[in-house]
A protein has these predicted regions:
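Protease zymogen maturation seam
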Residues: 2, 15-20, 24-67, 82-83
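Extracytoplasmic low-complexity, Pro/Thr/Ser/Ala/Gly-rich segments
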Residues: 39-77, 350-360, 369-388
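Subtilisin-like serine protease catalytic core
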Residues: 60-70, 77-90, 104-155, 244-248, ...
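Loop/turn elements at helix/coil->beta-strand transitions in domains of secreted/extracellular proteins
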Residues: 66-69, 137-141, 168-174, 198-203, ...
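Substrate-binding/access-modulating region of protease and related hydrolase catalytic domains
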Residues: 147-219, 266-268
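C-terminal subdomain of the subtilisin-like protease fold in secreted/lumenal serine endopeptidases
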Residues: 175, 240, 293-396
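Extracellular S/T/G-rich loop segment that most often corresponds to the catalytic His/Ser-adjacent loop
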Residues: 221-289
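C-terminal membrane-anchoring or membrane-association module
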Residues: 397-425
Length: 425
């Protein structure tokens, strides 16, 4: 096992950020904001079935994530929400539209997204038995605000800058509930994700939602070394609507019947791998807190090695290494590793960014749309998911992923050929 390396000196942002142009996005009408009083304890905390089903409460007997920093790259976290008071310790805006601390929820479509994500990762709850409590309630949050859409700053540039800022400002874990809706990524991301890898930061990304037309895991989760998170139903089956499939899925986490905090003090039920991802990010924070000697590769190895297999084939294209198990990830005996079992972006760059490198993207199979569905457009956005207000008197808000500019789709995975080779060695 390698000792956890010291954080490197800040590297400058790449002088030229090469970014793919965004496809025009279709914006849906703005929905009524979910500003409402905090719901009663039995309608929020008691709905968090994953705390017991996935060993999170048991893991809290060892640690609650103290001293670990999770960066949320999303639409801007409402740091004043009762469930997040004291959790957000800083942030930054890369969209050009948010406030300087990245804590202004940007909308209209994405206004709820980041706050929901943050609450599942490191929410404190509004009381001992009320509000949403995250998987790592003692971890801290950095909020990096993004804004995606036809009239916004280039999304690729925002993500690259946001990742580098997060690394340079103390993030131990980066949670990405967003996608390019393609398996490849721009060269500007090479610099950003390499910066995270070289500075010992765990990067976790969502595998996407088939319900939004994303049939195949997409970047940033296709980047080697990134832990891709798929979604399962309450019963532990791969979600038909809230999870994409791909050979690079790392672990599965709950993605249906979720509840999260929304700006203004309210809560909403929702589904999608946007929610599964921060749960895993919180569990990664528990592992980092319990095992401070581990580097990022060791943290990821503990998470995938202790996952509960669902099939006899591991990893499986639908379930990866299995269902996340927080208690085992924190406490089980796990063999040490010297390298990230999910690959290395540094090695990938060496192999595939040469002038004479093979064009691996054109040789990969295209995702096949489900029967009766149109393929998802090439678009950048945060994960679309169904969202229903919990507070009485607040109308339900339904978000249809690929039809919203700010909530197009979320996905995650790994470049297929490269990761297949890595896992078979």
């Amino acid at each position: 096992m390698r000792a956890r390396p010291a954080r490197r000196v800040t590297r400058p942002l790449a002088t030229a950020l090469v970014a793919a142009a965004l496809a025009a996005l279709c914006l849906a009408p703005a929905a009524a904001p979910l500003h409402a009083p905090v719901a009663a304890a039995d309608s929020v905390r008691d709905r968090q079935y994953w705390l017991d089903d996935y060993g999170i409460r048991e893991a809290w007997q060892v640690t609650r994530g103290e001293g670990v920093v999770i960066a949320i790259l999303d639409s801007g976290v409402d740091a004043g929400h009762p469930d997040l008071v004291g959790a957000v310790i800083g942030g930054h805006d890369v969209s050009g539209r948010g406030n300087s601390t990245g804590t202004q929820p940007l909308g209209p479509q994405g206004i709820t997204h980041a706050t929901m994500v943050a609450s599942l990762a490191a929410g404190r709850g509004s009381g001992p038995t009320s509000g949403v409590i995250g998987a790592a309630p003692a971890a801290s949050i950095l909020s990096i605000s993004l804004a995606f859409g036809a009239n916004e700053r280039d999304g690729d540039e925002q993500v690259a800058e946001g990742i580098i800022w997060a690394v340079d400002n103390g993030a131990d874990i980066i949670s990405l509930s967003l996608t390019r809706n393609q398996i490849d990524w721009p060269e500007s991301w090479d610099e950003a994700f390499l910066h995270a890898e070289e500075n010992d930061v765990v990067v976790i990304a969502a595998a996407g939602n088939r319900g939004n037309g994303t049939e195949q895991v997409s970047a940033p989760a296709t980047i080697p070394g990134v832990l891709a998170v798929g979604g399962v139903t309450r019963s532990g089956r791969a979600s038909d609507n809230a999870s994409s499939q791909g050979i690079t899925i790392g672990v599965m986490a709950p993605s249906e019947n979720l509840v999260g905090a929304v700006p203004g003090g309210g809560h909403a039920s929702w589904q999608g791998t946007s929610g599964a991802t921060p749960i895993v990010a919180g569990i990664a924070a528990l592992v980092r807190a319990a095992h401070p000697e581990l580097d990022a590769a060791g943290v990821i190895n503990r998470i995938i090695s202790t996952a509960r297999p669902v099939t006899t084939t591991v990893p499986d294209p639908n379930y990866g290494y299995g269902l996340i198990d927080a208690a085992a990830a924190v406490s089980a005996e796990v063999a040490e590793v010297d390298e990230n079992p999910l690959g290395s972006i540094a090695e990938w760059i060496t192999l595939y960014r040469r002038a004479d490198a093979p064009d691996i993207v054109s040789t990969l199979p295209a995702a096949r749309p489900a029967l009766g569905r149109e393929p998802a457009p090439t678009a950048f956005g945060m994960l679309g998911s169904s969202l229903v207000a919990l507070e009485p008197g607040i109308p339900a808000l339904v978000i249809i992923g690929s039809t919203l500019g700010a909530l197009a789709t979320l996905a995650a995975g790994g470049v297929l050929r490269f990761v297949t080779r890595t896992r078979s060695e």
